UniProtKB/Swiss-Prot annotation:
This is Methylthioribose-1-phosphate isomerase. Residues 40-113 are annotated as: Thioesterase. The gene is mtnA. Gene3D superfamilies: Hotdog Thioesterase (3.10.129.10), translation initiation factor eif-2b, domain 1 (1.20.120.420), Translation initiation factor eif-2b, domain 2 (3.40.50.10470). It catalyses: 5-(methylsulfanyl)-alpha-D-ribose 1-phosphate = 5-(methylsulfanyl)-D-ribulose 1-phosphate. Its EC number is 5.3.1.23. It comes from Aquifex aeolicus (strain VF5). Substrate binds at R176, G177, A178, R211, Q309, N360, K361. The lineage of its organism: Bacteria, Pseudomonadati, Aquificota, Aquificia, Aquificales.
């Protein structure tokens, strides 16, 4: 198996091996239209970095290697149509700790140079069997789901054998995060139709009606129904949805990490990491890639009331990977910006409209307004599967309203008078004009041009 398939890396966009020897590798990258960064035809640096990363993987020649780039320099611009050769050589070898020097050339001109280090060598299998942080595993006739309501103090796995159990888990937020919900629903469809032999329309409607805002849910179920009608193997289709999401997250991480300055203090909201996706993450995936890329970042983690996805889940992921961070109350963010203690904000998305409005966890709009007031860049990271081109404006999005009890009770303890009512909106809408850019696996787009990310 190609190492890129093993790790969920896009094979077409990371180049083709032309020479592999012990401790050395060369990769040829033929640039194409989809790699454009702007109207001038320049190639986004993330694709050069991806080819360099792949060359370093081949040079190290370990099936389960993960590398981090450091001292990276983009020396000359690359245009669509240019052919780039990336040459990687292992310069230091101390067992599991290796250093790889990579240089990329356009003809005789050096366009990129950098160092790559093995961060960890782990048993990481695709469709498999084991992964560092992963919210679910498909086991053929059942879905194993990490119950995120129990984190960070307990790691409890639910064994779901029916589509009704999957629907309940989605509705009650045992799983959350738009991409993870989409993947989970796809496997729920497999359980209902293939394992339980239930009516497909009934299964579809039950799963669809669990959460009204997350577009990945509808996107995944529509794709599963289409696959069924076309006579495809729906189990393989669900696996493909999972694989594509992980691959998209890795690309987003590579592309998005370029906008993160060295020594940056990054603020993020809710949980947008591996727990919210098929692995790696969207906004937190960008942060993760910047960390492993040697950016020496620090993360401010919004606690994200009332469900505390930031304090419970994002912090849990950051602790697991030793990424420096501090948890803050949601109301602290504005003061930190005023004091110059936030360099940029990166959040995820549950739905993106055709004009670039974004539905995301409640509190996102507040952060965007604060960023505009304090001149702090505000980025959204999401896969193209989150873009709903059928909806033009955020005003058309249904905002989920959840139980008031989730506001009045925290950690099992009542924190408000039982006679008091509460309003619990799960999401808000951030208008396109407040967003600096939207990071996708296809590149970084201005909000008003986001539908271009859907073009082949």
């Amino acid at each position: 198996m190609d190492i890129r398939t093993h790790l969920g890396i896009n094979q077409e966009l990371s180049g083709k091996p032309v020479k592999v020897a012990e401790g050395y590798a060369e990769v040829l990258l033929k640039t194409q239209e989809s790699m454009k960064a702007d109207d001038k035809g320049l190639v986004h640096g993330g694709f050069i970095f991806s080819a360099a990363d792949y060359a370093s993987m081949l040079a190290v020649n370990h099936p389960n290697v993960v590398l981090a780039g450091a001292n990276v320099k983009f020396l000359k611009p690359v245009k669509v149509g240019d052919e780039i050769i990336c040459k990687a050589r292992v310069s230091e070898d101390k067992g599991k700790k290796k250093k790889v020097l990579v240089e990329c050339f356009k003809g005789e001109d050096k366009v990129f140079e950098g160092e790559f280090f093995t961060v960890f060598l782990i048993d990481m299998f695709w469709r498999g069997e084991k992964m560092e942080v992963k919210p679910f595993y498909w086991k053929g006739d059942k879905l194993l789901l990490l119950d995120q309501r129990k984190l960070p103090h307990q790691e409890v796995w639910l064994e779901l054998k029916t589509y009704e159990e999957v629907a309940k888990a989605i509705k009650e937020m045992a799983v959350r995060g738009a991409p993870a919900i989409g993947c989970t629903a796809a496997y729920g469809f497999v359980l209902g139709v293939k394992v339980q032999k239930e009516d497909p329309e009934k299964v579809y409607e039950t799963l669809k009606n669990t959460r009204p805002t997350a577009y990945n849910l509808f996107w995944a179920l529509d794709r599963m129904m289409k696959a069924l009608k076309e006579g495809k193997d729906i189990e393989e289709e669900a696996k493909e949805i999972e694989k594509e999401d992980y691959e998209a997250n890795k690309r987003m991480g590579e592309i998005g990490s370029e906008i993160v300055p060295l020594n940056a203090k990054v603020l993020t909201h809710c949980n947008t990491g591996a727990l919210a996706t098929a692995g790696w993450g969207t906004a937190l995936g960008v942060i993760r890639s910047a960390h492993y890329g040697g950016k020496n970042i620090f993360v401010w983690v919004d606690e994200t009331r009332p469900y505390l996805q930031g304090a419970r889940l994002t912090a849990w992921e950051l602790v697991k990977e030793s990424i420096p961070h501090k948890i803050i109350t949601d109301s602290t963010a504005g003061f930190l910006m005023k004091k110059g203690m936030v360099d940029l904000v990166i959040v995820g998305a549950d739905r993106i409209t055709a004009k670039g409005d974004v539905a995301n966890k409640i509190g996102t709009y507040t952060l965007a307004v604060l960023c505009k007031e304090h001149n702090v860049p505000f980025y959204v990271a999401a896969p193209t599967s989150t873009i709903d081109s059928n909806i033009k404006s955020g005003e058309e999005i249904i905002i989920e309203e959840r139980s008031p009890e989730e506001v009045k009770v925290c950690g099992g303890c009542a924190i408000a008078p039982k006679e008091s009512d509460a309003l619990h909106l799960a999401f808000d809408i951030t208008p396109a004009e407040l967003i600096t850019g939207i990071i996708t696996e296809k590149g970084i787009f201005k909000p008003e041009r986001i539908t271009e990310a859907l073009k082949d």
